[in-house]
Curated annotation (Swiss-Prot):
Gene3D superfamilies xref list: GroEL, GroEL-like equatorial domain, TCP-1-like chaperonin intermediate domain
Gene: groEL
Lineage of origin: Bacteria, Pseudomonadati, Pseudomonadota, Gammaproteobacteria, Enterobacterales
Source organism: Klebsiella oxytoca
Stated name of the protein: Chaperonin GroEL
Pfam families (UniProt xref): Cpn60_TCP1 (PF00118)
Family the entry assigns: Belongs to the chaperonin (HSP60) family.
Primary location group: cytoplasm
Length: 540
């Protein structure tokens, strides 16, 4: 086992604070409308330019192991805030730095660290409740656009695009961000249910100009099996041909004789058919087939429940107003499934989302809800260079998370004002003893830090502006972009309550642990083995 280096008390805390400050100082230059960019060197490819706090935090590793421990613990604050609300990482880092710096001063002055932590925790619990009372619901497009604009570093086009996307696909819809091909940002909305599977044979194409299969009012056959024998399908094909409607087959696979016969029938015009593979794999495929069945009012033909393809009738088939299939995707528009059945299915999937343990599973389940309940919108980010594209895409992602958080828990006045008002409201809060009271004061003083940092980044004097804001009340604050005072809501400067709440909770959680640290242990650097030089022997 490697030898360890151990530091105690003040020595440990000073080192830890130095690491915290290096990371926080790098992150906090990005805060606010006049925050600056940070350039990150990559081991391969061009450097990345970012104004996203968590991207900066993730890049920082310090040489001194004790300092690095401090930095890594604050990195955890940024990551947790990012996971919870998707934004507010810089605010969380600034809050953590302020609580740690003030807290360690109190420890050095002889306060009991455990009581300080209890005081900080008490102040944060009260602050979260106060934030909830200040919170205003965010439901109209204008407020959503404002939240998106602020989170995308005052880029109005991004805010408007996100608000438009939410209008089109609803609050539950899936909105994804992709690389665009031009210089302008675009919004693409897919109505209906789309999945990533294309036609199994190009001979199904009936719109050569677009290279797609478009079928009006088709029947939809859903089968949880491979279809290779055409005899199994004859009864269904005959019934569909009599009804004079096209047929879409969605199955595990359609191959061999069955596929060849379907192609021949289509080319001769006997019955219009198109076949695609079912989306997903394994259990997810079964679930997605069931989703399509619910949407189209059909039944999944599955041997697991004793159904055979030969015995399928028109009643077992789903229907939709239109189905469009191209090389890579299939879109089902206006399925005829009952609204009550679709809502029931959505509720069932939401329950699974609550119980999901992995982020990947949760994301896939949310996609399924969106496909059933709303639709899918794609924001295509335009930029002149790849470096700009990456930076802008990260900002759009942040803005998207912020707007979702705003819709979920409402909004409060932005620009650090909400936390200043909360701190003023809690000024009379007391605890069991003097050390805990100091802990409360540490937390309340730290709540001014985001406002001060925004002002500092704008090149103004933080103390003057902070005093002016504290002298006002309600949503009165300082607009760092235009350098004027006024009502933050009227200025359109809003922060999602969830983002502010998460930033405060995670910052206090990690800062409380660091204040109570008394000893730090790390591996001693390994000294390289001495070079033995060349072995003696006969000369050549």
């Amino acid at each position: 086992m490697a030898a360890k280096d151990v530091k105690f008390g003040n020595d440990a805390r000073v080192k830890m604070l130095r690491g915290v400050n290096v990371l926080a100082d790098a992150v906090k230059v990005t805060l606010g409308p006049k925050g600056r960019n940070v350039v990150l060197d990559k081991s391969f490819g061009a450097p990345t330019i970012t104004k996203d706090g968590v991207s900066v935090a993730r890049e920082i590793e310090l040489e001194d192991k004790f300092e690095n421990m401090g930095a890594q613990m604050v990195k955890e604050v940024a990551s947790k805030a990012n996971d919870a609300a998707g934004d507010g990482t810089t605010t969380a880092t600034v809050l953590a730095q302020a609580i740690i710096a003030e807290g360690l001063k109190a420890v050095a002055a002889g306060m009991n660290p455990m009581d300080l932590k209890r005081g900080i925790d008490k102040a944060v619990v009260a602050a979260v409740e106060e934030l909830k009372t200040l919170s205003v619901p965010c439901s109209d497009s204008k407020a959503i656009a404002q939240v998106g604009t602020i989170s995308a570093n005052s880029d109005e086009t991004v805010g408007k695009l996100i608000a438009e996307a939410m209008d089109k696909v609803g609050k539950e819809g899936v909105i994804t961000v992709e690389d665009g091909t031009g210089l302008e940002d675009e919004l693409d909305v897919v109505e209906g249910m789309q999945f990533d599977r294309g036609y199994l044979s190009p001979y199904f194409i009936n719109k050569p100009e677009t290279g797609a299969v478009e079928l009006e009012s088709p029947f939809i056959l859903l089968a949880d099996k491979k279809i290779s024998n055409i005899r199994e399908m004859l009864p269904v094909l005959e019934a569909v041909a009599k009804a004079g409607k096209p047929l879409v087959i969605i199955a595990e696979d359609v191959e061999g004789e069955a596929l060849a016969t379907l192609v021949v029938n289509t080319m001769r015009g006997i019955v219009k058919v198109a076949a695609v593979k079912a989306p997903g794999f394994g259990d997810r495929r079964k679930a997605m087939l069931q989703d399509i069945a619910t949407l189209t009012g059909g039944t999944v033909i599955s041997e697991e429940i004793g159904m055979e393809l030969e015995k399928a009738t028109l009643e077992d088939l789903g229907q939709a107003k239109r189905v469009v299939i191209n090389k890579d995707t299939t879109t089902i528009i206006d399925g005829v499934g009952e609204e009550a059945a679709i809502q029931g299915r959505v509720t069932q999937i939401r329950k699974q989302i609550e119980e999901a343990t992995s982020d990947y599973d949760r994301e896939k389940l949310q996609e399924r809800v969106a496909k059933l309940a709303g639709g899918v919108a794609v924001i295509k980010v335009g930029a002149a260079t790849e470096v700009e594209m990456k930076e802008k895409k990260a900002r759009v992602d942040d803005a998207l998370h912020a707007t979702r958080a705003a819709v979920e828990e409402g909004v409060v006045a932005g620009g650090g004002v909400a936390l200043v008002r909360v701190a003023a409201k809690l000024a009379g809060l007391t605890a069991q003893n003097e050390d805990q009271n100091v802990g409360i004061k540490v937390a309340l003083r730290a709540m001014e830090a985001p406002l001060r940092q925004i002002v500092s980044n704008a090149g103004e004097e933080p103390s003057v502006v902070a005093n002016n804001v504290k002298a006002g009340e309600g949503n009165y604050g300082y607009n760092a972009a235009t350098e004027e005072y006024g009502n933050m809501i009227d200025f359109g400067i809003l922060d999602p309550t969830k983002v502010t709440r998460s930033a405060l909770q995670y910052a206090a959680s990690v800062a409380g642990l660091m204040i109570t640290t008394e000893c730090m242990v790390t591996d001693l650097p390994k000294s390289d083995a001495p070079d033995l030089g060349a072995a003696g022997g006969m000369g050549g």
